[in-house]
Amino acid sequence: MIKANVYSCSKFRFLYRRRFLSQSSFVHSLDANVSSLIAAVKSCVSIELCRLLHCKVVKSVSYRHGFIGDQLVGCYLRLGHDVCAEKLFDEMPERDLVSWNSLISGYSGRGYLGKCFEVLSRMMISEVGFRPNEVTFLSMISACVYGGSKEEGRCIHGLVMKFGVLEEVKVVNAFINWYGKTGDLTSSCKLFEDLSIKNLVSWNTMIVIHLQNGLAEKGLAYFNMSRRVGHEPDQATFLAVLRSCEDMGVVRLAQGIHGLIMFGGFSGNKCITTALLDLYSKLGRLEDSSTVFHEITSPDSMAWTAMLAAYATHGFGRDAIKHFELMVHYGISPDHVTFTHLLNACSHSGLVEEGKHYFETMSKRYRIDPRLDHYSCMVDLLGRSGLLQDAYGLIKEMPMEPSSGVWGALLGACRVYKDTQLGTKAAERLFELEPRDGRNYVMLSNIYSASGLWKDASRIRNLMKQKGLVRASGCSYIEHGNKIHKFVVGDWSHPESEKIQKKLKEIRKKMKSEMGYKSKTEFVLHDVGEDVKEEMINQHSEKIAMAFGLLVVSPMEPIIIRKNLRICGDCHETAKAISLIEKRRIIIRDSKRFHHFLDGSCSCSDYW
């Protein structure tokens, strides 16, 4: 019977969404039995259909049968019609605890914690005086996660203790999650430690909340502990652990988790393998991403799109286009996310005509209306190609209000081409949209500095100070010995600093003698002398990280560096030179994309 109901539910949804039946004829065709009507209500997607089903219920069966009244209440709430739900609930001849829980659950699903408290109060003072149970409090906690205050959460905690429901592991897990989301890890850990029986969800929750609070390494410690006490990881475990690997940026750790995924029999799980593919890409291992993708049996649209995103982020636009065409060839329908990555790939590779073609194809062939992300990509594509007025024209023609992402793309292009007039317009709009984002002020200041407008640049920097905005400091990260090493500008804090600085001098000497290289001091946007500029630019964090990488990373392995800001022009040229002189492969991920340096060239073709 249960299988039949599930089948019926999916069948009803299919028929209705495909519009094989009109709403009225769809309802008329239903058998007048409780099981069929409950299945139809559960799959209901419109208020019109809900009302027709409500009429069918009134004419055909009684609210007393099969909890159908509860299902209708939940349906009305799910569709945003609170008044109808409340009216129906009040008209129900018999209301048990399930009925009250349905009402609370409906409000919880929409984050209406105040309404949940109101219904809970009514429930307890009603004639019968129902006692809240595990289901009641799970809904309450869920609503609290949406946006409840700490006081409200603690109030629910107190009620749970009062009614003796804190022994239920599901309720405790929900509280562990809620306290973690509020940043109160002490309370989460206390609840976890006090649990007499910790299930896998308990351990998974501890991994996730530590990750969310910037403690990925501590979360992984809970993962290891869960395995030691005999819990086998499931899909949720691996997804959380893979996110932790991304946060920590340790490739060897990711490879170890990959082995556990294979050993645990999850290599056929498309959700996990897609996350693994994405992780390798973000860690600079594009080849590993490709290997994982090609090992997936019948990859779905998410896997195809993830691989497309990998090519885009790494700047391999032509490969991204080939991948997209192959995806379409195999009958996988692209969605708006697919086109965002495809247009991004075109933007990162300077493929203007291709980008225009796919932007047009998206709406004409696939009936996908362009969204803000698509316009951001197109503005970036046109702007970085030097077509600043075309980019600005596209913004003015947009059918919706341009977002900060759109104006940010234009401002970035203005920085490249030193267009102070258009850059000022873009920055002013960004100041309105994102008044607390210091990056926009820094960008405009840099545009003025690059154009020699030192007074204007100083004015913007002073404006930043007045607003209390702080410029983010540049730092670079590199993995070695299962540890992430961090470097900042002019960094001498590392134990191997003397060796690093010696290597840095050696590199500069080779670059000058073998290539006649001169530092690109125009990228130092400070009104100081040339000698000072050269000294400043030679101590950028990514250069220090590259020197360290040359010392410790095996020649058989690429030197992979992460930079929190955009790589500067001189560091970009230096990386190309080092890759040629030292015959090393260098991969740098900055705030925008990956750069693959080999034999004196970069994968971005200097288009970045």
UniProtKB/Swiss-Prot annotation:
Compartment list: Mitochondrion
Predominant place of localization: mitochondrion
Cellular component GO terms held in the UniProt record: mitochondrion
Pfam families named among the record's database cross-references: DYW_deaminase, E_motif, Eplus_motif, PPR, PPR_2
Keywords, sorted A to Z: Mitochondrion, Repeat, Transit peptide
Region (Type E(+) motif): 482-512
Extent of the transit peptide: 1-28
Region: Type DYW motif, residue numbers: 514-608
Protein name, entry field: Pentatricopeptide repeat-containing protein At5g40410, mitochondrial
Species name: Arabidopsis thaliana
